């Protein structure tokens, strides 16, 4: 009975947040996307957690993102372009890369910085017209064991972060499921699946785009 009441309360809270975001002023970047008439209701629902997060992160210096665009905007754009599931997988991959080692890998590849605040420029769509010695397909396959694909692509530290992220989400999902938590169980299983496939996509992306340039063919 208690769980049913909690589920109903959460549904009402999410509905109120969704409606208020839908009709409020576009104070935060993702609000513009949510209020757009060009995307479906399903995508807008997927963007709701990002909207909530931006209301926290944009009002605290503790949550400043080192990337441009920020991880929340990156994820929002991915959902808008590729749909909720694929977009969340792509967003998960970016969040894994948003770690203390990002600046090292960025400088190693001589990638650009955002002029206004020095953040690391990293868009969804990359335009590197070069051949890589690493196989994106092979990187994806070996990522069946999380982290192995990124390590193969030359990003061992990102691989460790990916392995740790998958472990945390998966172990949390198993714990919640074993305790028969009807709310957190399915939710965390979904998160675990997203981070796992995000790791596979991240290995593919690392092997295809984030490689040292031997020939300047851009």
Where is each model-derived feature located?
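Positively charged n-region of N-terminal signal peptides that target proteins for export
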Residues: 2-13
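Sec-dependent N-terminal signal peptides
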Residues: 12-21
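Bulky hydrophobic segments
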Residues: 28-32
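Boundary at the C-terminal end of the N-terminal hydrophobic targeting segment
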Residues: 22-26
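Hydrophobic alpha-helical membrane segments
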Residues: 33-218
């Amino acid at each position: 009975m208690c769980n049913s009441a909690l589920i109903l309360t959460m549904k009402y809270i999410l509905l109120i947040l969704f409606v208020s975001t839908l009709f409020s002023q576009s104070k935060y970047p993702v609000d513009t996307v949510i209020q757009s008439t060009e995307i479906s209701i399903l995508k807008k629902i997927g963007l709701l957690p990002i909207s909530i997060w931006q209301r926290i992160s944009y009002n605290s210096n503790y949550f400043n993102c080192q990337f441009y665009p920020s991880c929340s905007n990156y994820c929002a754009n991915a959902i808008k372009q590729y749909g909720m599931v694929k977009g969340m997988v792509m967003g998960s991959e970016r969040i894994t890369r948003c770690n203390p080692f990002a600046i090292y890998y960025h400088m190693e590849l001589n990638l650009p910085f955002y002029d206004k605040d020095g953040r690391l420029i990293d868009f969804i769509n990359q335009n590197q017209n070069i051949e890589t010695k690493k196989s994106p397909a092979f990187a994806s396959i070996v990522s069946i064991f999380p982290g192995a694909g990124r390590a193969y692509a030359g990003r061992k530290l990102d691989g460790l972060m990916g392995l740790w992220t998958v472990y945390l989400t998966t172990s949390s999902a198993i714990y919640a499921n074993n305790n028969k938590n009807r709310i957190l169980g399915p939710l965390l299983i979904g998160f675990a699946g997203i981070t796992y496939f995000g790791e596979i996509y991240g290995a593919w992306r690392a092997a295809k785009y984030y490689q040292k340039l031997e020939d300047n063919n851009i």
